[in-house]
UniProtKB/Swiss-Prot annotation:
Keyword Acyltransferase: no
Cofactor info, note text: Binds 1 Mg(2+) ion per subunit.
Gene: glmM
EC number(s) recorded for this UniProt protein: 5.4.2.10
Gene Ontology BP terms: carbohydrate metabolic process; peptidoglycan biosynthetic process; UDP-N-acetylglucosamine biosynthetic process
Signal peptide bounds: none
Name assigned to this protein: Phosphoglucosamine mutase
Organism: Xanthomonas oryzae pv. oryzae (strain KACC10331 / KXO85)
Length: 449
């Protein structure tokens, strides 16, 4: 496949008002999407549009709507909703595509566009390529009698809450649970508190007063220390934090210890194995902690690593017939319950596992020993990151680093595809070994730069 002009691994994202993150580009993007869907479907397409709570979402929602309607597509405006909710609604409302206006865990001054297929999955490469090609064609407005219509959908919240509840057993209850819930002033702010309270939990809510500018600002999954402090303050059993668009989830245990995506993956894998639910291989990424790999091996649970990005985790799960995977950042995939990473659904799966296994998140993690891991970003003065990584002296240093931690950890290099940076990561069961190996390897990269 040729290099993408606009799309990254998870749609389009950037600073509002700069480059493609502008109203005029998004207007053309909506028009291109409408034309491509009409050609593929051979009929008037229906497109759902959702967004998170950042203020620029209003501008981009209007631009997308206008571009789609001009191309002859009908539009249903969902309003602020978690990204995975749009994936679900696109499928259940029989739409031809879903669009989410969000920059996920980024600050309010960023925004982005991501797409879902009619099946509620990430848009395939061929369709994205067709949209990019259509963007280079002139804006097209169909005849008046063929213009699309736009309506607001009023029952989306109720539909999504029932979908989330259906992901756990019918008798599932959270009456045992006192929790702190951090909604990142984002797309889960009006849904997650209602859902967990309906299931019986005592809920202390933070980060649920969006003003368009405070999304992810000192709250949410990128600021887990805030959640941890509140868990200790209120004496809660645990805390749950989502990111701005609700596709990530991290937690804190009853002592306020941060619980990342690797930890949650372990809780689910062990519980699902015991209940017979686990199928295929558990999938992590290059960044998944070596300690998790070792812990799963001790349980005879097969594990494989994909490239960083939930798109690649999803691809590996589908190819290998698995249903459970995720990233350290909190993107968890439970493909027997949802088509994409869903923070609320993933949190419910963890709570269901805890309900079976003694209610304590801290105890559920007592048999997982993660190893020290650190990443250093080496900025390059000149030359492409990929070329630096492939240089003979850097490859020699990498082989030496890998030999130093063999059987005790890992060492690897990741050239950035978007900036002149090489990411150097080392992990080992001994902190001094990890740091010494990291210093030598990152030094070799700096010397080559």
């Amino acid at each position: 496949m040729s290099a993408r002009k606009y799309f990254g691994t998870d749609g389009i994202r950037g600073r509002v008002g700069q480059g493609v993150i502008s109203a005029d580009f998004v207007l053309r993007l909506g028009n291109a999407l409408g034309r491509v869907l009409t050609q593929i479907r051979g009929k008037r397409p229906l497109v759902l549009i959702g967004k998170d709570t950042r203020i620029s979402g209003y501008m981009f929602e209007a631009a997308l709507e206008a571009g789609l309607v001009a191309a002859g597509a009908d539009v249903q405006l969902i309003g602020p909703m978690p990204t995975p909710a749009i994936a679900f609604l696109t499928s259940t409302l029989r739409a031809d595509a879903g669009v989410v206006i969000s920059a996920s865990h980024n600050p309010h001054y960023d925004n982005g566009i991501k797409f879902f297929s009619a099946e509620g999955e990430k848009l395939d490469d061929a369709t994205e390529a067709a949209i990019e090609a259509a963007l280079d064609a002139p804006f097209h407005t169909v005849e008046s009698e063929r213009l699309g219509k736009a309506i607001r959908t009023r029952d989306a919240i109720g539909r999504y809450i029932e979908f989330c509840k259906a992901s756990v057993a019918r008798g599932f209850t959270l009456k045992w649970l006192k929790m702190v819930l951090d909604c990142a002033h984002g797309a889960t702010y009006h849904i997650a508190p209602m859902l967990f309270r309906e299931l019986g939990a005592e809920v202390v809510v933070i980060g649920a007063a969006p003003d368009g500018l405070n999304i992810n600002a000192g709250v949410g999954s990128t600021h887990i220390d805030n959640l941890a402090a509140k868990v200790r303050e209120y004496g809660a059993h645990l805390g749950i934090a989502f990111d701005g668009d609700g596709d990530r989830v991290l937690m804190a245990d009853d002592q306020g210890n941060p619980v990342d995506g690797d930890d949650l993956l372990y809780v689910l894998a062990r519980s699902w194995q015991a209940s017979g639910r686990l199928t295929g291989t558990v999938v992590g990424t290059l960044m998944t902690n070596y300690g998790l790999e070792q812990a799963l091996a001790a349980l005879n649970i097969p594990f494989q690593r994909a490239k960083v990005g939930d798109r690649y985790v999803h691809q590996a799960l589908v190819e290998g017939g698995g249903t459970l995977g995720g990233e350290t950042s909190g993107h968890l995939l439970c493909l027997d319950r949802a088509t994409t990473g869903d923070g609320i659904v993933s949190a419910l799966q963890v709570l269901e596992a805890l309900g079976r296994d003694g209610h304590s998140l801290r105890k559920a993690l007592s048999s997982l020993s993660k190893v020290p891991q650190k990443t250093v970003n080496v900025r390059l003065d000149g030359g492409a990151a990929k070329a630096i990584v492939e240089a003979a002296n850097v490859q020699q240093a990498l082989q030496q680093a890998q030999a130093a931690v063999q059987g005790r950890g890992r060492a690897f290099l990741r050239p950035s595809g978007t900036e002149p940076v090489v990411r150097v990561t080392v992990e080992a069961d001994d902190a001094r070994l990890m740091q010494d190996t990291l210093d030598r390897l990152s030094g070799a990269v700096r010397d080559a730069a």
